[in-house]
Amino acid sequence: MSAIGIMACSISHDMRHSLTAIYANAELLERHDICASVRDDLLLEIQEAVLAMTERIDSLLQFGSNGRNNPLVHERVSLVVEKAVAAVKFHPDGRNVSITVGEFPPAKAVIDVRNLESAIYNLLLNACQAAARSTQVPEVKVHLAEVDERIYVTILDNGPGIPDSVRTTLFDPFVTAGKPNGTGLGLTLARRVAEEHGGSVCLEKSNRERTVFTLSLTKNRFLPLEDLKSGRAGFEICGNRSANCS
């Protein structure tokens, strides 16, 4: 099936699923014999369905966009990471996950704040969804490191690991293995944003106890789009760090 066909099927399935939940719960809310706690649960499910649809639409818009539309600023990367962590804690998939952060260095870089926050948020959300399937208390850890002219954001989860069958296509659009509520675009978009910042996203490690992703960027280098199209971005950053770099 073509990429357009896969995208159309994916959108149709996800939107129909969310709309069905909204419609069914709205019908139940019309009843006068349900207690307050059940009513609250139904309203929460509607909110989660709307959030899922909004995330799907936002991901598709970002996936289909050409170029960068946000201003570049010289900013502390730690502030962006902290905002992404705070945001994912409010997501339904992040509420019951223990998210801990290490001590962040005050490293600055020339960045697209909005897109970089979105990329880190996507990685965090994936980690939370994986950790939720752990047989232990679900945990996600975030570390930030500065090495010469590069900055690394590392995200660890204690989920069951990534299946070998999808590792070669992990960064392809619409790969949703183990994520029934995922858009299948999070890693694709995170990789694109990292490459725009002169870096990449790597799967450093994945087994039954831990999965580790690292997003890297270069402090003072923001690649022009023509360099990205040539396919040169990313490999020099992570090429020696992982066999699963993209």
Label every model-predicted segment.
Residues 96-108:
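Conserved catalytic submotifs in the C-terminal HATPase_c
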Residues 66-70, 108-111, 177:
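Conserved micro-motifs of the catalytic ATP-binding
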Residues 162-174:
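Short conserved segment of the HATPase_c
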